[in-house]
Design a protein with these regions (language model features):
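Glycine-rich anion-binding loops of enzyme active sites
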Residues: 37-40, 50, 84-173, 288
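Extreme N-terminal cap/leader segments of soluble proteins
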Residues: 1-62, 81, 90, 109-113, ...
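Small-aliphatic-rich amphipathic alpha-helix that forms the alpha element of a beta-alpha
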Residues: 63-87, 108-116, 200, 218-224
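Residue-level signal for inorganic ion chemistry
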Residues: 35, 74, 82, 121, ...
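Short, compositionally biased
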Residues: 169-186
């Protein structure tokens, strides 16, 4: 059966029936708008757009993978502000020939990723489309904490990361080479695994600037450097290159460090902390904030690279 057979309201009912609501949702799907509690009095909001052929391919990723990925990249933005995600809203553009099984898998992917952080899919919209288009808006609560923006890094602070780097880029390279059997690396492209708790955890540790690495470490740290009016120096010897990453690079004739520095969509967290802070695992110090501008990698030349939607 296809969603065209169900019709718009049949599709909406099918989606809503698979989505339990958490405590933050006072009124969920079914009315003109949802109502959420806001204990902190401030609401953190982020939105992202995913377009078939640009951000995912249905012949590479299942509906479930795509739902998990779309939720993850929005939930990680909320966590990167030091907030706890509470809900997401999903706008769907779908071709009429999409099967109900695929739709169920997509819905379950959204639901299961949200469940990792205690969030809910609290509403959304649906429309016909020539290709699959997903618009996701995520909300979060600061729990009385100050938000961690990109603008607080100062010379003398350390730069640390929490999460994997380069894995999604390596997985994409393997898929492009026809290596869909690329194991954990391909899975990292299909379904990133942000360490959500590290976002609010960093805020409690005193992080002065933070973001999630969606467009590549160099490019994203460049945003912190620009917003903070500082430079950042990275130590390449401190950057983690997993054995699987090194092996894939050998097979494809690539530089694994290039994946680590410029690969996007791992949604690791990168943050600046005062130099005297003792950071627990999984935080790993990889550089320092310096006077100046831009991001510099010791022993390497060139400009920061990464993902740009218009290049």
């Amino acid at each position: 059966m296809t969603i065209g057979d169900l019709g718009e309201f049949g599709v909406i009912g099918r989606i809503a029936g698979r989505l339990p609501q958490g405590a933050a949702v006072l009124l969920g799907p079914g009315d003109d708008a949802a109502i959420l509690s806001a204990p902190d009095g401030r609401v953190v909001v982020s939105t992202d757009l995913l377009i078939e052929g640009r951000h995912f391919r249905r012949n590479w990723s299942s509906g479930y993978d795509i739902g998990r990925k779309a939720a993850a990249q929005n939930l990680s933005d909320i966590a990167a502000m030091g907030a706890d995600p509470t809900a997401i809203f999903v706008g769907l553009g779908l071709p009429a020939d999409v099967t109900t099984d695929w739709l169920d898998a997509l819905t379950d992917g959204f639901r299961d990723e949200c469940a990792l952080v205690g969030a809910s899919v609290a509403g959304g919209d649906i429309s016909g489309s020539d290709t699959v288009v997903l618009g996701v808006t995520a909300l979060g609560d600061l729990g009385g904490r100050q938000p961690v923006t990109r603008a607080g890094a100062r010379p003398g602070h350390v730069v640390a990361i929490a999460g994997r780097l380069g894995h999604a880029a390596a997985g994409l390279a393997l898929l492009q080479a026809g290596r869909a059997d690329g194991g954990d690396l391909v899975d990292a492209h299909r379904r990133p695994r942000p360490l959500y708790a590290c976002g609010p955890g960093a805020a409690r540790l005193g992080a002065t600037a933070m973001l999630d690495v969606s467009d590549g470490l160099l490019q994203d740290l460049g945003h912190i450097a620009e917003a903070s009016g500082t430079g950042i120096e990275l130590d390449p010897a401190a950057l983690p290159v997993a054995p699987a990453l090194a092996e894939a690079a050998r097979d494809l004739g690539a530089d694994p460090l290039e994946w680590v520095l410029t690969g996007g969509e791992d949604h690791a967290f990168a943050a600046a902390f005062p130099g005297d802070v003792r950071l627990p695992s999984p935080w790993l110090v990889v550089g320092r904030v310096i006077e100046g501008k831009g991001v510099h990698v010791t022993g390497r030349s060139g400009t920061a690279g990464g993902w740009d939607h218009f290049r």
